[in-house]
Swiss-Prot record:
Sugar-modified residues: 106, 109, 330, 473, 538, 622, 685, 827, 846, 929, 939, 1323, 1419, 1517
Domain VWFC intervals: 663-708, 828-902
UniProt key word Ligase: no
Source taxonomy: Eukaryota, Metazoa, Ecdysozoa, Arthropoda, Hexapoda
InterPro entries linked: CCN, FN3_dom, FN3_sf, Ig-like_fold, VWF_dom
Name of the molecule in the record: Putative epidermal cell surface receptor
Species of provenance: Drosophila melanogaster
Tissues with expression: Expressed in most, if not all, ectodermal tissues which produce a cuticle.
Topology class, membrane: Single-pass type I membrane protein
Length: 1693
């Protein structure tokens, strides 16, 4: 002040300025004093507490900022005495709540209360023997009351936190144990009346709240402890505060009951002087032992949350039937129902929580009468550790039932969203605190849950908070987390709040709008607390260590507690949530910072899911009855929002849980309990073009992808994104990903990104010369560039192999990506002997000759041997004796020959002659090499008796054709694929004009043939498994076919004269596999070897009168009597049809009865005809009569006749070739057995004939005759059925093939074919199975049709009937009923033993000579081996030779490549030196000719030892020793030196010297092996050795030599260490004299030279020039080297 007066006295403007500054300073000091006085009453405590701990900071309710200032610690010392005295005075006033409240209200603002409650211990904590005591003190900041928050629980759930709390300041000091968390429970309420009375008292106290502390509280916001650590963060806490919230009450005298004050004084034993002490005095200096204080200055969110904790600690809960009304009674009595918490005096400054719902600070004496509809979750802030002794002194163990422990974690409140609305709907229920001697006046119907303090500033209250606490806060305190009684289903009801009726009066206030408030946390921690460890999964973590809980949270250890936060923030979400399924146009991308997080990148605008952008959003309630509104904030560090479960379709789904509703929708549980449902599949483009098709989505079976042609027009768009010709996986983040920019501030235009470049929508661009791309709304669409010059090249030149652009050096570069045109540079033509051969064409034989067959392929002529190799001996499968085999030309090939039987030309009888011998022999001896060539255009068969078609290797075992005749309409073989099934033609009534005489004559001829062939033939049954041989019937051995019961030894064929064109067996069988063998040794179902004479059959069977069959014992085909005249066969009728031939075959005796059924026919006719058979067989030898078409040349029959149109016709001009396998003078061997007939029928020839299957014919013919007999009776005049079947065969065991023709009149009509078939006994075709075959467009285009009938049963006899169903006609042409038998499933039987011995590869080389494998030369790393050459007869079986070797100690043989069979030596490389090897020689056969064979024995040999050429030793010798030099020499280096040594280094060292000196010499060929060492010291001992640098990179040293130089004068300066060469170093002397002499001599020489030149020049001047120029010498000029040199010199110039 004096300074101010002096400056004022001085006057002037400076005085005015100083006066103003002084005034401002005084005002500031005044305000500071007022603030200090106000702050002195805020923290409750004693003098000692005030001395050791400064006044704590408070927060204002201003929504914009929280100011905090620090003051010296001595300021708070002035508060203690007044506070203590007031507390004592209040304690002496009254023990009731009302009186205490009134008395406390009349006192100054420095009064404070002390609440003491008994905390019941949960049963789940066996290690705790006493209840933790927590002292809670009110502080100076007081806020207006608001309706407390309610938490809605289900009616069947416990009210987790139903405490209605008095508003307190958020600054607390709560002692903690080692777990850094305290469990506390609310006291049980007693009666409703008591609670109502206490609420009325609280309402009265609430009305006494003074609002005079507004300015004081603002000043206190600037007050701060000087030694605290400040951390600030923005939080979007509950910012809807009451209008009175900015008027904080600094003291709590008007709201603190006196009873509580007295309780605090008594319980803690605090004397008026402020020294802290407990009631038991066990820890008198607890205040001093407290290591740290934690001060938290938070925004309204934290302050209100802590107020809830204080309410929870100081009130009790009660849940009524419809409402949950909570009240708190603080007592220290021993009632088992009351839970007390003792708050120590030193912790009162931070022990008082504030209301977490309304951001208002209310003094502890302020009470509000309200009814809590639901339990109010609270949070507490535990900052100090409390000793067990202190707890034991002030806490009484309750006998009440244990209640759930709810963890409250500092800093975060997980259920604020749902609780804000509830708190506004109910009044703040505040109960006055009872004294320590007052019994608990309130009880609850249900036990209240404990409250576990589990860290700073965070709470997890009730059942709803436990799961969130576990998943988000991560505070794992085993002693405080008893979740046994906590319902985890509370999360389901978090999103909804219920407002119950209130029976008590409420005090409502107006909430201020929500604004962001910075949260300032002040922490002062000591070292031992900072070093506390956290436990998780039986693992301890230090303070500050991080722990990741899968992809959900990232937790930090903070003084024994886990501080957890979600790993994925903002728009990112955890991996595996499958959010991408919500929008199929979005791609999931990994976040670079965290691999567990994903972010969505969409190619089109997507409906944003209801998720909050940041995790730190804080809830607020805007009014009563409104649901919680989630507002995003920009503070990621704020409290995470609660994830409410979703209720959808009577189901409950967790946050981010995925639900698939069929193939219609996919739903995700979003935040706020909203189920976000979207279509599962993208919407289709309903106006799609024909170019687009839908295919199944590989990632979702319910969806389809639309794929379109990339060559779209300008107006077309491809609906499905990322689908083009690029084979990119949609899941992959391809280079042309469509990126949609953010649509927030800038509203950027969407663009496309392709290979790092940005393109606008609609922009076209080229991707090099590969593809043309366009950017549209769906993304990048690219089409491959195709040049017009590349179109139609195959049309321009189909034979061109290689094209090149014009010009040839064209290189594509945008925009010129296509050449002008293309020209062919290679069309594959070949040049052979000056003749151009087209590509893929054979070289004409007139150019290649008979040696080789050449072929042109891609410009190269490839040749191979023209003829197959011919073995030296006849093959064993020839049908004749090897002595009769000859090398004959292959038919149609004059160059090649093969083994075949020598042909024998028989005699040819004339017309009308019965040449029985020739006929029978010829019948059985049709040559094996005879073939029938059937053309497709002419109805004729050409027989070539003298030539055999060329047989390839794969055809050598097939029988050649035997002049087969095909009884079809066109004479051609029907189309068929081999099978064992057969079919039969129906029998026709025979014509009446056929004579019996001809039949009897033929019968006699046939019996004679059976007698002659009896001894050489074998009877076999094709369908029997056993093999039997029985005597054959006489007269040629022909077996009759019975129409009755089948004879056990007689196979049955089809109707007489009809050929069943069936190929041998279904072709898909492997011919190398084992196969069935019939009794005569011929494989069934396989092409046999070249057929023997016993199997050369005609395909036409003789005719027989059904009325005169032969005896079954003698057997023979039906025959025709030769009574009919034989005509010349060259002029046959032009219209002979197969039906006429069949009719003749099936005719009956004129006037005779019709044939009986099959079984009766066989039984009745057999005994009658036996005598007649014998008589006829004796009179007439048998004849084989073929029946043919008229106009078709038939094969040569044995007797020269055939039946044509019912008339016998002679074929005189066709020669008959007898059999080849048997000498001709034995007529019996020329006969043919019925088995051979069957064999020829079953086993076809090479390519033109097909045989019948005996296995099928046995049943099919037999059962078919009964049907045919009926047809014969009813339709005697019917010549043919409507539909003719040509082929009915089994192509495999389960399918058959049908080839048939329809009448020509039905061609070009519309209709279908109905096939009825059955393998059952029923004859009713209407009950048979049906199969409809539809020709293309239902049009019968041709008369011949072919169908396959699948899905049949194997080894079954099927009856088949074909019906033609016409569209517009009532006529239905049908066929007869045919039978076919499917073969059984393939059975594998071993092959038969060959009758002759054929040696294999092993047998051929069994007796081969030893190849005498020897080692001719050896080395350390290789061996050269030699062996004898193979013989010529054995070389053709060997493909190559191979050597196999191994070490004697090894187990695995190594092998050389295949060595040519003509080589006799080989060198094995890369062997180990000095190692023994075992080597053997192996012959490798050709493929398919057996196994390899080892030749001779294994030999053993050892490689030589390895020779080291650098293993020489060098010896150094000292030759001449002088005073200062020494000469050395060495020896031992091989010649030449420069091959082994690069440089010599002579190293010498004296005894006195410390360093080595050396002399180097380069090794040269033919140089001296020595050097001279100079610069030595006289009379000195030296050690010398030689070191050589070898050419292989190594070094070698010699021996060491010691020598002593001769004594002499002092040594001259030397050149030791320099590179020296022997003889180059001379002693250094006086060189000046010699130098002068040399100079003089040089000068004289120069002068002499000049004089001589002058003389020569003068003489030339006087000479005359020559008349003729000197002749030029061209010798040097003509030298080529001279010219080159001159040219080079000229060019260089």
């Amino acid at each position: 002040m004096q300074t101010c007066r002096r400056r004022k006295a001085s006057g002037g403007q400076s005085t005015i300025k100083w006066s103003r500054m002084c005034l401002a300073t005084l005002c500031g000091l005044l305000l500071l004093g007022i603030q200090i006085e106000r702050a002195a009453s805020a923290p409750a405590g004693e003098d000692a507490a005030a001395t050791t701990m400064p006044p704590l900071d408070t927060t204002t309710d201003a929504p914009d900022a929280v100011a905090a200032t620090t003051t010296p610690a001595t300021t708070a010392a002035e508060q203690s005495s007044s506070i203590s005295s007031i507390t004592t005075e209040a304690a002496d006033g009254s023990t009731t709540s009302t009186t205490t409240t009134t008395e406390a209200a009349n006192k100054s603002n420095a009064t404070e209360t002390d609440f003491t409650t008994n905390v019941p211990v949960a049963s789940s904590l066996p290690e705790e023997t006493s209840v933790r005591s927590t002292s809670i003190e009110p502080i100076t900041s007081t806020e207006p009351t608001t309706t407390p928050r309610q938490e809605t629980e289900g009616p069947d759930q416990h009210m987790v936190f139903s405490n209605t709390e008095p508003d307190q300041s958020h600054i607390q000091h709560i002692p903690l144990r080692d777990e850094h968390a305290e469990s506390s429970g609310a006291d049980d309420a007693t009666t409703e009346m008591q609670r109502q009375r206490e609420q009325d008292q609280q309402q009265n106290e609430l009305n006494q709240i003074s609002n005079e502390q507004d300015d004081v509280v603002k000043d206190l916001n600037n007050f701060r402890h000087p030694a605290t650590l400040i951390t600030a963060s923005n939080s979007n806490s509950e910012e809807n505060v009451e209008i009175e919230s900015d008027k904080q009450v600094e003291t709590t005298t008007t709201a603190v009951p006196a009873a509580a004050t007295s309780t605090s004084t008594e319980a803690t034993g605090t004397p008026p002087t402020g020294t802290p002490a407990t009631s038991t005095s066990t820890v008198p200096n607890e205040r001093e032992e407290d290591p740290y204080h934690v001060h938290i200055l938070s925004e309204n969110h934290d302050r209100l949350a802590e107020h809830e904790d204080y309410q929870m600690l100081s009130t009790s809960t009660e849940e009524s039937s419809t409402t949950s009304t909570t009240s708190t009674t603080n007592s220290t009595t021993e009632s088992g129902i009351v839970a007390g918490i003792v708050v120590s005096q030193e912790n009162k400054a931070t022990a008082e929580p504030s209301t977490a719902t309304e951001s208002t600070s209310i003094s502890t004496s302020t009470t509000t009468a309200a009814t809590a509809a639901t339990s109010t979750t609270s949070r507490a802030r535990a900052m100090h550790m409390n000793d067990p002794e202190d707890e034991a002194a002030t806490t009484i163990m309750p006998d009440s039932e244990s209640v759930p422990v709810i963890n409250i974690v500092e800093g975060q409140h997980m259920l604020q969203q749902e609780d804000q609305k509830d708190e506004e709907e109910e009044g703040v229920v505040k109960e006055s605190e009872s004294s320590s001697t007052t019994e608990a006046s309130t009880t609850t119907t249900e036990p209240s849950p404990f409250v576990a303090f589990a860290g700073e500033g965070r709470s997890a209250g009730g059942g709803n908070d436990i799961e969130l606490f576990l998943h988000h806060n991560g505070s794992t305190h085993e002693q405080l987390m008893d979740l046994s009684d906590v319902s985890m289903d509370g999360d389901q009801n978090e999103g909804s709040s219920k407002t119950e009726s209130s029976t008590t009066s409420t005090t409502t206030t107006t909430a201020q709008p929500e604004t962001e408030m910075p949260k300032i946390v002040e922490i002062t921690a000591s070292g031992d607390t900072m070093q506390r460890e956290c436990l998780a999964n039986n693992k301890s973590y230090k303070h500050g260590e991080l722990m990741e809980r899968d992809c959900d949270e990232r937790c930090t250890c903070n003084r024994g507690d886990w501080m957890c936060e979600p790993r994925c923030r903002g728009l990112s979400y955890p991996r595996g949530s499958q959010r991408s399924m919500a929008n199929p146009n979005c791609l999931e991308k990994m976040v670079e910072e965290d691999e567990c997080c994903r972010v969505m990148e969409c190619s089109e605008p997507q409906l944003e899911p209801t998720v909050v952008a940041t995790e730190g959003a804080a809830p607020s309630t805007n009014g009563t009855g409104e649901s919680a509104v989630t507002l995003p904030t920009t503070d990621d560090e704020a409290t995470p929002k609660p994830r409410t479960d979703c209720h959808y379709n009577s189901g409950v789904y967790k946050f981010r849980e995925r639900l698939e509703i069929g193939c219609e929708q996919i739903c995700h549980c979003a935040e706020g309990g909203v189920m976000d449902c979207r279509p599962r599949c993208p919407e289709r483009n309903h106006t799609r073009l024909d170019k687009c098709v839908y295919v199944k989505d590989p990632k979702d079976v319910c969806c389809q992808l639309e794929l379109c042609d990339v060559t779209l027009d300008d107006h077309e768009q491809q609906p499905t994104p990322l689908q083009s010709n690029n084979n990119e996986d949609p899941e992959e983040i391809d280079p042309f990903r469509f990126q949609e920019q953010a649509r927030d501030a800038g509203g950027a235009k969407p663009t496309c990104t392709f290979k790092g470049a940005e393109y606008d929508v609609g922009q076209q661009f080229r991707d090099g010369c590969d593809q043309l791309c366009i950017c549209n709304e769906q993304g990048i669409h690219c089409a491959k560039l195709e040049c017009p010059s590349n179109f139609g090249l195959d049309v321009q030149d189909p034979h061109c192999i290689r094209w090149e652009p014009v010009p040839a050096d064209f290189k594509p570069s945008p925009p010129n990506c296509c050449p002008e045109s293309m020209r062919c540079v290679d069309n594959g033509t070949c040049s052979y002997q000056g003749v151009q051969i087209e590509n893929w064409s054979p070289v004409p034989a007139n150019l290649t000759g008979c040696d080789q067959h050449c072929y042109c392929e891609n410009g190269r002529v490839e040749c191979r041997a023209a003829c197959p190799p011919v073995p030296a001996l006849p093959p064993a499968d020839l049908p004749c004796h090897p002595a009769l085999a000859r090398l004959l030309p292959i038919p149609d090939d004059e160059c090649c020959k093969h083994w075949m039987c020598a042909p024998q030309i028989p005699k040819i009888g004339g017309a009308g002659q019965d040449e029985e011998t020739e006929a029978t022999s010829t019948h059985s001896s049709i040559p094996a090499n005879e073939t029938t060539t059937t053309t497709a255009t002419a109805n004729k068969s050409t027989s070539i008796p003298s030539k055999v078609p060329q047989i390839k290797k794969d055809e050598e075992k097939r029988p050649p054709a035997s002049g087969a005749f095909y009884p079809t309409l066109d004479g051609k073989p029907p189309k068929s694929i081999g099978g064992l099934g057969i079919f039969e033609k129906p029998e026709k009534p025979e014509k009446a004009h056929k004579k019996v005489q001809h039949q009897q004559q033929q019968h006699q001829q046939q019996e004679q043939q059976e007698q002659q062939q009896h001894q050489n033939d074998v009877i076999f049954d094709g369908d029997r498994t056993e093999e039997q041989e029985e005597p054959l019937p006489p007269n040629g051995g022909f077996v009759p076919f019975q129409f009755g019961q089948q004879h056990p030894h007689q196979p049955h064929l089809g109707p007489y004269g009809f050929y069943n064109p069936v190929k041998p067996v279904y072709e898909d069988y492997n011919p190398y596999e084992p196969y069935d063998i019939n009794p005569n040794g011929t494989p069934q179902g396989k092409p046999p070897p070249v057929p023997t004479s016993q199997s050369d059959l005609f395909n036409i069977l003789g005719a027989e009168q059904p009325g005169h069959p032969v005896h079954p014992g003698h057997g023979g085909p039906p025959r025709i009597h030769p009574g009919q005249t034989q005509k010349d066969n060259h002029n046959l009728g032009p219209q002979v049809r197969i039906e006429q031939i069949l009719q003749h075959l099936q005719q009956t005796v004129p006037g005779g009865p019709p044939p009986p059924p099959p079984h009766q026919q066989h039984q009745s006719l057999t005994p009658q005809l036996h005598p007649q058979q014998q008589q006829i067989s004796q009179q007439h030898p048998g004849h084989y009569v073929p029946i043919v078409h008229s106009g078709v040349p038939p094969p040569p029959p044995g007797h020269g006749i055939a039946i044509v149109d019912g008339q016998t016709v002679a074929y005189e001009s066709y020669p008959v070739i007898p059999g080849l396998g048997v000498p001709q003078h034995h007529p019996q061997q020329h006969q043919t057995t019925p088995q051979q007939h069957l064999q020829q029928t079953i086993l076809p020839s090479s390519s033109t004939t097909s045989g019948l299957s005996t296995q099928a014919s046995e049943h099919s013919l037999h059962q078919n005759q009964g049907k045919l007999a009926k047809q014969q009776q009813s339709g005697a005049n019917n010549l043919q059925p409507d539909i003719e079947v040509h082929t009915l065969e089994a192509i495999d065991p389960r399918s058959i093939r049908i080839v048939f023709t329809v009448p020509q009149v039905y061609v070009n009509l519309h209709g279908r074919v109905e096939l009825r078939y059955s393998n059952g006994p029923s004859n009713d075709t209407s009950t048979w199975e049906q199969q409809i075959f539809a020709p293309p467009e239902d049009l019968i285009a041709t008369s011949q049709m072919e169908f396959d009938l699948p899905s049949l049963e194997p080894n079954s006899l099927y009856k088949v009937k074909i019906t033609l169903i016409l569209r517009d006609l009532n006529s239905q042409p049908t066929s007869s009923i045919y039978t076919v038998k499917t073969p059984p499933e393939r059975t594998i039987t071993p092959p038969p033993p060959f009758p002759d011995y054929r040696p294999d590869f092993q047998d051929i080389f069994k007796n081969v000579e030893d190849p005498e494998l020897t080692v001719s030369e050896t080395n350390a790393s290789w061996l050269q081996l030699t062996w004898k050459k193979l013989g010529d007869d054995q070389m053709e079986y060997v493909d190559g030779v191979q050597l196999r070797y191994k070490e004697l100690t090894g187990m695995i043989y190594s092998s050389t490549p295949l060595i040519h069979r003509t080589l006799t030596s080989y060198t094995i490389q890369n062997l180990q030196p000095d190692t023994g090897y075992e080597i053997g020689l192996y012959y490798i056969p050709l493929a398919g000719h057996g196994a390899e064979l080892r030749a001779g024995h294994m030999i053993k040999v050892r490689t030589a030892q390895k020779v080291d050429v650098y293993g020489f030793d060098v010896t150094v010798n000292v030759t001449k020793v002088k005073t200062q030099s020494v000469e050395i020499s060495w020896n031992g280096v091989p010649y030449p030196e420069d091959k082994f040594v690069h440089i010599y280094r002579a190293i010498y060292q004296s005894d006195a010297g410390k360093e080595d000196s050396s002399v180097f010499k380069v090794a040269k060929r033919d140089s001296t092996t020595g050097t001279l060492i100079m610069d030595l010291k006289p009379g000195t001992k030296y050690r010398l050795w030689l070191e050589m640098y070898l050419t292989n990179g190594n070094t070698k040293k010699s021996n060491v030599v010691n020598f002593i130089t001769k004594p002499g004068g002092p040594a001259t300066p030397g050149k030791t260490g320099k590179l020296l060469t022997a003889g180059t170093d001379q002693p250094v002397g006086d060189y000046y004299g010699p130098l002068v002499v040399v100079s003089v001599i040089a000068a004289l020489a120069i002068m002499s030279t000049l004089a001589l030149l002058l003389i020569i020049t003068r003489r030339r001047v006087h000479q005359t020039a020559s008349i003729t120029p000197p002749r030029k010498s061209d010798a040097a000029y003509d030298n080529p080297s001279y010219k080159v040199e001159i040219q080079q010199e000229t060019m260089n110039l």
